[in-house]
């Protein structure tokens, strides 16, 4: 083999090696993209069942109805003895209640367990007559009549349960912001005493949009 043939053969070998080295990353990239897509789908599936401890939006990631927004209030139940009850009427801020004829579509309760939570609680929201004093007997009867959905939230050895939301639809009732004082959040501590540092309830009231102030507070 003369020198020119040897040089040509060497060039061809280098070309083949270069072609191989270029194709290898391409194949790896394709496999990585497939794996990333699979992990992304898996993460979305798992995320759907996770508790929403940080909750920047209404109903997790669900959007409000067109033309609606929401107002959040936070309730921290006091100590509730085993087998006893707690009730608190919904009191929205004055800046919202002045638009008392704006319609309300949904109420959502989100249970936020604190690090010491190790109990079982039942949570619901009910329309309560103004004459009711939210006594233990009255709240017990409302839990028993089955007239409203109830969220049973409990501690699990593997961590807190995924389902931490209760959604109450008021669309058919044509309820408005002025009606909210007639509704109350009710809690039943089933198995043991619920301490004050175990639980926080976030109540989101979805209502028609209200005008926002264009003047800074004094």
Swiss-Prot record:
Q: Which residues carry this modification: N-acetylmethionine?
A: 1
Keywords of this entry:
Acetylation, Capsid protein, Ribonucleoprotein, RNA-binding, T=3 icosahedral capsid protein, Viral nucleoprotein, Virion
Write out the annotated subcellular location.
Answer: Virion
Q: Which GO terms describe its molecular function?
A: RNA binding; structural molecule activity
State where composition is biased (Basic residues). Answer: 11-21
Compositionally biased intervals (Low complexity): 1-10
Q: What is its main location?
A: virion
An example Gene Ontology CC term for this record:
ribonucleoprotein complex
User: Where does the record place the region Disordered?
Assistant: 1-29
**What family does this chain come from, according to its entry?**
Belongs to the cucumovirus capsid protein family.
Domain writeup:
The N-terminal arginine-rich stretch does not seem to be the major RNA-binding region that allows formation of an infectious ribonucleoprotein complex.
What the protein does comes down to: Capsid protein. Probably binds RNA and plays a role in packaging.
Protein name per the record: Capsid protein
């Amino acid at each position: 083999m003369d020198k020119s043939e040897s040089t040509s053969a060497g060039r061809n070998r280098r070309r083949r090696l270069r072609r191989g080295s270029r194709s290898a990353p391409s194949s790896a990239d394709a496999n990585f993209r497939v794996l990333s897509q699979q992990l992304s789908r898996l993460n979305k599936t798992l995320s759907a069942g996770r508790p929403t401890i940080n909750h920047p939006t209404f109903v997790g990631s669900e959007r409000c109805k067109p033309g609606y927004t929401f107002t959040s209030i936070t309730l921290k139940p006091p100590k509730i003895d085993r087998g006893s009850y707690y009730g608190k009427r919904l009191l929205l801020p004055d800046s919202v209640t002045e638009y008392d004829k704006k319609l309300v579509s949904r109420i959502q309760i989100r249970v936020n367990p604190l690090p010491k939570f190790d109990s079982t609680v039942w949570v619901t929201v009910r329309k309560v007559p103004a004459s009711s004093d939210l006594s233990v007997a009255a709240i017990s009867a409302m839990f028993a009549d089955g007239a409203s959905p109830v969220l049973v939230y409990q501690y699990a050895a593997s961590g807190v349960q995924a389902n931490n939301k209760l959604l109450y639809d008021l669309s058919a009732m044509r309820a408005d912001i002025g009606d909210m004082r007639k509704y109350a959040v009710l809690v039943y501590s089933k198995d043991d005493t619920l301490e004050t540092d175990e639980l926080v309830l976030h109540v989101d009231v979805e209502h028609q949009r209200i005008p926002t102030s264009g003047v800074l507070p004094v």
